[in-house]
Amino acid sequence: MSLTIAVAGKGGTGKTTLSALMIRCLRERGLTPILAVDADPNANLGEALDLSADLSIGQLQSETLKQVHSLPAGVPLSRHLEYELHQAIVEGEEVDLLMMGHGEGPGCYCAVNHILRRYLESLRSSYRCTILDNEAGMEHLSRRVSHGIDLLVIVSDASPTALRSAGRIAGIADDLELEIRRRCLVLTNLRGELSDRAIAELEKTGLEVVGRIPFDQEVAELRLADRPIDDLSSEAVSLTEVSEMLDRLLQKEEAA
């Protein structure tokens, strides 16, 4: 069984940290290989995983659009692009990274988009788990992954602003008509109880809260030191909470 989890949230809420923590927990459970897809133009998932990508899908698309009419005779566009796409995958130990980069501009080419979507959907089937770290607008999710999303995890901190954004993200997912089997909310960087305003905004989202992750000083220090998530101690409070949350989610997936 292949599992695809998409993570989305307002910038600064900790969605990339959550994605990296989930990847670590999945790897520790032996649910490998894992494909980590950084679909946020402000890409930093690779840094959290200690993987470095020099080439993004956005860059490949731009280059292909420039070359599409000058390919050698007898070389199909699909073969050329799929070869280049394979070069963009950064292979790690049990975890591979693919960076989406910036979305296409006005030079959009439908044949290229079709090949990209087909390739990415085929690629996911080669992995036990795929984690998609998305930007709030989920542009890449809508353009590149049309189906097969098992779980959409929307991330928010305790601020009313972030919770309103979480509700809007859920609405965007509806508007895009994405095939998502289940969606939920994870609260991050918690320091005590939610305010009355935050509770009101939370209720408006209509989302099930599946995780409440407290502020973790060790994670904060890790980020300041520019160190990967694997350097986090096994006793870290955030890792413990994400591990327990993931167990609950996986149990529900198995029962579905």
Stretches with model-predicted labels:
Residues 225-236:
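C-terminal boundary of histidine-terminating zinc-finger modules
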Residues 28-91:
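N-terminal phosphate/diphosphate-binding loop that engages ATP/GTP or pyrophosphate donors
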Residues 58-59, 210-216:
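Beta-strand->loop->alpha-helix junctions that form or flank phosphate-binding loops
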Residues 51-55, 172-173, 200-204, 228-230:
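Short, hinge-like loop/turn segments at secondary-structure boundaries
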Residues 79-87, 91-92, 96-132:
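Cytosolic-facing regulatory segments adjacent to core modules
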Residues 3-41:
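Walker A/P-loop phosphate-binding motif and the immediately C-terminal alpha-helix
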Residues 111-212, 221:
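Conserved catalytic-core segment of NTP-binding enzymes
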